[in-house]
Each structure stands twice: as structure tokens, then as C-alpha cells.
Amino acid sequence: KQGNKKDSFEPGIELLGKVTVFAEGCRGHLGKQLIKNFELNKGKDPQQYGIGFKEIWEIEDKNHEEGLVMHTAGWPLDNSTYGGSFMYHAENKQIFLGYVIGLDYKNPHLSPYDEFQRFKTHPAIKKIIEGGKRISYGARALIEGGFQSLPKMFMPGALLVGCDAGTLNMPKIKGSHTAMKSGMIAAETINEHLKENKNLSIYDEKFKS
């Protein structure tokens, strides 16, 4: 309480490195501070955010078609709110069902979770999950500004990767792919930086090429 050290006190550990990679995900606590302090988003469009819900269902065999992919846009949202869904038929009679809604919606009474539940009442969705059971669920924030909102991803002694930078490609619905690729390019960049003394700015060039 008074700031006095007890016998069990352990000082914090200093982790030192020539290059630090920040990979905290969407709007990471440290990442957003770095973007602000180093003005990494100067001249870029404002970032956009969304919330995504995902459920894993085990459905009846007659409703399952392994490999089937379904994407939708709009309903049940109105014309002033953007969002859409995905459904992937996986193996073992499982489907991955989800809905994403932009967080710039104007209606203060809109509940993204309730809209997702309403979406599941659509006949095309209801007939697939009817008789099945939900076995897992989750939600996460998404960074959706795209290429025009992508900040500089390098700064002195550090790199941003994945959603900490905003690498999600919304038009192609590619998030994990671009995040992993940014990590691979970050590793290549650090290797060249340490071995050949190349500037960390090559990370941006490599990622955008």
C-alpha cells in the first residue's frame, strides 16, 4: 500500500533487443501508442473498425456439405450500416458461422450481437443450423481500414505486424493470411538488418510489393 518492498519482492525483468516486433492484434495497447508517438499514420485515411462474431456448430448430416463456402452482405442491417456474414462447412459435420458489423453504425440502439442472432433466422441459414448444436463461440474486434489506412509499419528499433498495423484485406476477406505474411516479411527484414545493416524501412517496401 505504501510502496514498501516486501521480502517476496521481485524486480521487473528488462527485455532488451535490437529489434522488437509488436503483434498485439487490433488496436493493441502499445501499438496504438507507437503509431501516435512516431506519427506512423500521418497522411493516411482514418482507421476503421468492426466487430466480428463467430460460432462453431455441429449440424445434421443432411445439412452438411463439406467445403461449401457462403458469404453474404447487408441483411439484417439497414442501408446505412455495413456488414456481412460467412459460413464455412468444415469436416466432421461442423460449420463456422459468423457475422461482422462496422463499428461506425449511426443507430445508438443497434446491438451487433442481436443483429447476428437475427441473421440466423433467415431461411437460408435457419434450415442449415436447425437440429444442430452450437459447440463454441467468440467475438473479436477487427481493423478494417485497408491499404489506404495502413500506417508506416517500421520505426527505430521496432516493427508492427498483423492487425497491430492493420494488414487485414477486407475486400478479399484475408486476415490471417496477411498477418502471417507480415510476420514472415518482418523476420526477413530483421535478418537483413542484423546481417547486412539494411534499414528497417525495407519492411514496408517488401510488404507492399
Residues of each region from the PLM?
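Active-site-proximal substrate-binding core of FAD-dependent oxidoreductases
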Residues: G166-K172, M184-S209
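Conserved alpha/beta core surface patches that mediate binding of polyanionic ligands
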Residues: H71-G83, G138-P151
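Predominantly flavin-linked oxidoreductase catalytic cores and closely associated redox partners
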Residues: K1-K127, I185
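Alpha-helix capping and helix-loop boundary segments enriched in small/acidic/polar residues
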Residues: K44, N107, S149-K152, M170-T178, ...
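Domain-scale detector for complete catalytic domains at protein termini or as standalone homologs
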Residues: G3, G132-K133, G138-L142, K206
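Flexible, glycine/charged-enriched surface loops at secondary-structure junctions
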Residues: K127-G138, E196-I202
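Extended, hydrophobic alpha-helical segments in both membrane/secreted and soluble proteins
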Residues: F154, L160-D164, S176-I190
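FAD-binding beta-loop-beta segment adjacent to the flavin cofactor pocket
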Residues: A139-M170, S201
